[in-house]
Amino acid sequence: MVSIIEVTDKAQLRRFVDYPNELYKDVPQFVPATYGDDLSDWDRSKNPAFEYCDARCWLAMRNGEIVGRIGAIHSRKANDKWGANRLRFTQVDFIDDPEVSSALFRTVEAWAKELDCTAVHGPLGFTDMDREGMLVEGFDRRSCFFTYYNYPYYIDHMAALGYAKDVDWIEELITVPEDEATIQRWEKISDFVLKRHRLHIHEARNRLSYLPLLKPFFELVNLAYAPLYGTVDLSDRQIKKYSAKFAPLINPNTTCFVMDENDRMVAFGVGAPSLASALQKHRGRLMPTGWIDVLKAFHRNDTVDLLLIAVHPDYQKKGVNAIILSKAMKGCHKLGIKQAETGPMLELNDKVQSQWKDFQTEQHKRRRCFIKQL
């Protein structure tokens, strides 16, 4: 017998957040989210998204043990933007038992009907900066620290529950060129584009010098990502929140902010050495000692995670991405990085995918947003 309990206190929330560590404890491909970030996302006093969202989360219990979890988010801002009253499901995990998955989704769908929603879709977060998409290909590959991992049986459960594909994201593994001729060729292209469009790269020796750029960075995120599935503009409070979250991840060697002649940001690329091993070792916890291994990962690593990349609409199709890629290539070469892993890219987003066409790549993962009409 499965019982569903709503998470209403901090002790239950800690169990909700920590459950994936138990479910995937023997799975080397699973990488936990940072524990503190997951906790704060559900805290109304710390997450500005609650200004326009309602959210609830539940645990599935059997014989006193957790056998599943699920969250749900009603984003009025997203529904207004996209013209559809939908409920998002998020952070869903469960054992391979249809009774459990059915009980979890029935609970979410019941709330959706109370809200007069026409559909349930996900997994999606409060914003596009959160984890999203259920893994449907690439189960043998280790996740990035900012993406979900799930068992293959989830797909069958979703189909049995009446959920179908809405959109897919793909991820690429890119081999970093090591030959000097390729690096120099990209540097020449970068120099040409910089001169032609009177642009320059914001040079910085450390993370602190990037801090004043984080607000215009997220303002450009709002502009460039606006047409993408499920996105909503980040508010000033959210920009402040995500700036604090992103600042420690910025590595000057693998980060590029491109500015125009008036020092306005026109493009960016942010990469960070992979934190997967460090977070696995400490179950997503930075304290008391997890932060030490995170710092080590920044200095000794063979993989860089490409977190975000975008170009202002006025500068698209002008070769500006070559500036970002050239700097990233040189930075990876300096750090001994052998491969780069992209974040999820919408499968129909040709603008983003086309920038990897000159590199040796492997599409190694695919994740999906499911939807069910009510």
Language-model segments: residues:
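Catalytic cores of nucleotide-enabled group-transfer and carboxylate-activating enzymes in metabolic
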Residues: K10-L13, P32-R44, E51-A72, W82-A84, ...
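Acyltransferase donor/substrate-recognition loop-hinge adjacent to the catalytic core
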Residues: Y148-G230
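Extreme N-terminal starter segment of soluble prokaryotic enzymes
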Residues: V2-S3
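Short beta-strand segments
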Residues: H121, L173, F257, V270, ...
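Acyl-donor binding region in acyl/amide transferases
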Residues: D80-G162, V232, H282-D358
